[in-house]
């Protein structure tokens, strides 16, 4: 007989460890499509002392089955080169509400952004979370109502679903 652990304590410890193993091995990892999916969270306007918004924060949820969302700073060769369609992996299109409805306004530089690699330590693993991107607004817009369309690309160039914000009124 072991003088530090009586037999009954060893059996209880062994049964506890086996029980913990069984319970944790039964937990299923969430499975998502390898094509990224996004869902709206919110759009927040930030005003300074003037009557028009100076910044907006676009926030949305995302999920991806193989976790390949994000670009490294060195990802600048094709297909991620500046002249290509995949330089920005968060694509944001800007629309102004004009007399005849919404019209897209192409900006230079665009509101689009490069999301950094989100899952560097666990490549190939399911990932989900939310992204918030701060956008600098025109302090003297020609039209006071706008909206955005946005989507993301993963590293495999899979395009997520496209979302549209509700009308955003820039004036207080």
Show the residue positions of the predicted features.
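Bacterial N-terminal signal peptides that target proteins for export
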Residues: 2-12
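C-terminal motif of bacterial Sec signal peptides marking the signal peptidase cleavage site
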Residues: 22-25
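Bacterial signal peptide processing site
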Residues: 27-30
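First exposed extracellular module after export/assembly in secreted or surface-exposed proteins
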Residues: 36-172
């Amino acid at each position: 007989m072991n003088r530090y652990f009586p037999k009954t304590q060893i059996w209880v410890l062994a049964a506890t460890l086996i029980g913990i193993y069984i319970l944790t091995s039964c937990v299923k990892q969430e499975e998502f499509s390898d094509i990224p999916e996004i869902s709206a969270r919110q759009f927040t306007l930030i005003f300074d002392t003037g009557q028009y918004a100076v910044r907006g924060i676009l926030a949305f949820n995302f999920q991806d089955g193989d976790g390949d969302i994000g670009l490294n700073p060195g990802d600048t060769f094709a297909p991620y080169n500046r002249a290509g369609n995949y330089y920005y992996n968060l694509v944001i299109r800007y629309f102004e509400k004009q007399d005849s409805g919404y019209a897209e306004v192409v900006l230079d530089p665009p509101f689009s952004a490069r999301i950094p690699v989100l899952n560097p330590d666990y490549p190939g693993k399911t990932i989900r979370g939310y992204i918030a991107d701060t956008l600098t607004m025109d302090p003297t817009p020609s039209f006071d109502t706008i909206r955005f369309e946005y989507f993301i690309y993963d590293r495999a160039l899979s395009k997520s679903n496209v979302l549209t914000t509700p009308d955003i009124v820039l004036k207080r």
